[in-house]
Every structure is written in C-alpha cells, then in structure tokens.
Amino acid sequence: MSFKKTSQILKIKLKKSKIAIIDIGSNSVRLVIYPDSGKYPYPLFNERINCRLGEKIHKTNNLSVNSISRALKALQRFSIIIKNMEVKHVIPVATAAVRNAKNNKEFILPAEKILSSKIRILTKNQEAELAALGLLSNFPVKNGIIADLGGGSLELILISKGKIKKLVSLDIGHLVPVDQKEVLQLLESVKWLEKSKNLKLYGTGGSFRSLGSAFIKNTSYPLFLIHGLSINTETSVMLLDKMIEAKNKFPGIPQNRMPTIKNAANIMQNLILSCDPKKVIICGTSIRDGIVSEINPSKIINPDKSSNIKYFTKNQRFSGMQNTIKKILDPLVENLIDRKFKRLLKLACQLSDI
C-alpha cells in the first residue's frame, strides 16, 4: 500500500526563536539547540550522551533501572544548558525503546518533570516519516530507499519522484541481538523491498555512519567526509563481512560501538543483499532534521541550498569580502563560463569567508 503524507507529523508551530530538540533514542540521548527556529543550518549546541535505554529491553520488555537513571541524569544536564542558553521552546521526542517498554512511564513522568515539557513518544510511522523528511530536506533524492538504523528499530522508506511512497518500521536495531535468519524473515515481510532493487540506498544513523568511517579508514579514502559518502555495493558487503568477524577492535569503528557492531553489520549486510542497491550512500541526517523541516514549512523537500547563503554570510569575518572576490574573478571567467556556472561561482564567493 502506498503511503500518503499528512500535512504535518507532529503539528508543531513556533514563533521565530531558539529551539531545543531532545532526541531520546534507544542508544543515546542528544540535545541540539538551533537559532532562528532551526532555519539557520548550523546548531548552536550539539551534545550526545550514551544512555543505552534500549539495553536488554528485548529480554524484559522494560527499561532497566540503570538505563533510566543514566537518561534522567543526561536530561538534568540538558535542562540546565537549555535554561542557561535561554531557550524557550523545547521539543523532546522519544523513539523505539520508550515506545516499546511496558514501564515507560517510570521514565517519562520524571523526565517530563525535569524538562518542564511534554515528551512526544513517536509512533513507528512518525519516526520513519521524520527520518525521511530530515534526509529529503538536506539531500537531493529522486528515487531510492532510506534506511535509518537505530538501537531499537530499523526504518525503511521508499522514495519515488522525491516523495515518500512507502514506509515501514521494523523492531530490529543494533542493541537487539538477532541472528541472520531473524533479520531475513523481517526483511522478507517488507514486500515492496524485493521489488525495489537497483536503487540507491541512503543509510542514516550511527551504525551507517560507522560503516562510512570504516570505509574511509580501511580504503585510505582521501577525505574524511561521511555525509554524502558513496560506497560501492560489493565493497559495502565485503567490509560488513569483516566487521561481523571483528572481535575487540576494527579500524574506523569507535570503541564504544564495538560491543554492538557485529549485530549492526549483520542487519546492514542483509538489508543490502535484500534490496541490491546501485550504491550505498551514507548520510548524516536524522529525525531532528525532520523536526526542523516541519517547524519551517517553507523549507521544501529537496531544497535549493542557495537559500541558506544569507545565514552563512552573516558569520563572515570581513563584511563585503564576497563582493571583492567576485570582482577579482569576474574578468577572468567572463567569456569562459555559462550562466549556471556563474551562479555557482557567486555562491562560492559568498561561502569563501565564513
């Protein structure tokens, strides 16, 4: 069945001001503070604390006392930061671990008291849609599959002609031990996945970013730029195979990821084998970017990033520097380039001093 996008996911409307988004995930709790309701593309503050709320939830269906304690301490710290930075609008959201736990009120009630704000527990569809919206608002995707692998869930979204066509959220994540048979059974239950081969696979979440980091380290890739990194499908499968066999360490993988990297690699590898993509593209976006996009309805899907230039130029060290550089270059390229390149040259000049 095709997916019809609602007009809004969380129905958030805010006046122009600083906003704080708190992403309470299965593995970590993250605070990101943006100026100007998130229209400015670079955050004022960004911090993540590993709380592992989803740890052992697959065994007990409950959040553990220790994980709740860790998460509440993280929120206490974040609450102080939010107050000191004079942020009026706080948007806390929780995903798979809190959503699936029978005892989630033992965490939610004290957490809301600490933050003085209601925590939105995202449904599976909301989480998947926000993950897709976050990527589409920051990356040009016409057709492809978005895979957001977290600690407690895997969201799969089919994109057709730049829009969400189908989506699903599976209860597998790098904190949930599953064998290959279980992963394959869950992936086979997604009927549209098998029919969506030879598309680009866009991977988001810490596990996919770890794959990107491992690729850079193990292939001597010249640039350490993970967002937008494109990896050959065969290379991805081979690298994930090595990650599955790794024991105590693996080049490019953060040490705190090693305890769950085998499970994450197993999920990613079987996903890649199931949908047989053209390429695997690593993306640094998240549901937080989706929330920012929803707050700013004028920020259309697959936007022209030149609209962000006015925010970048505000942070120039020397006012008017972009105009000076352009005046120097214009005579050199006047008869050599077309209108499209001239536009790009102008943007490059505007970005030259930020």
Identify the meaning behind each predicted range.
Residues 1-20, 24-29, 34-94, 105-118:
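N-terminal glycine/serine-rich phosphate-binding loop of ATP-dependent small-molecule kinases
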Residues 33, 56-84, 95-105, 115-137, ...:
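Helical "lid/coupling" subdomains associated with nucleotide-phosphate turnover
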Residues 19-23, 144-148, 201:
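Short glycine-aspartate micro-motif
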Residues 14-16, 26, 151, 196, ...:
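A generic fold-level signal
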Residues 26-28, 135, 150-156, 206:
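Ser/Thr-glycine-rich phosphate-binding loops at phosphate-binding pockets of nucleotides
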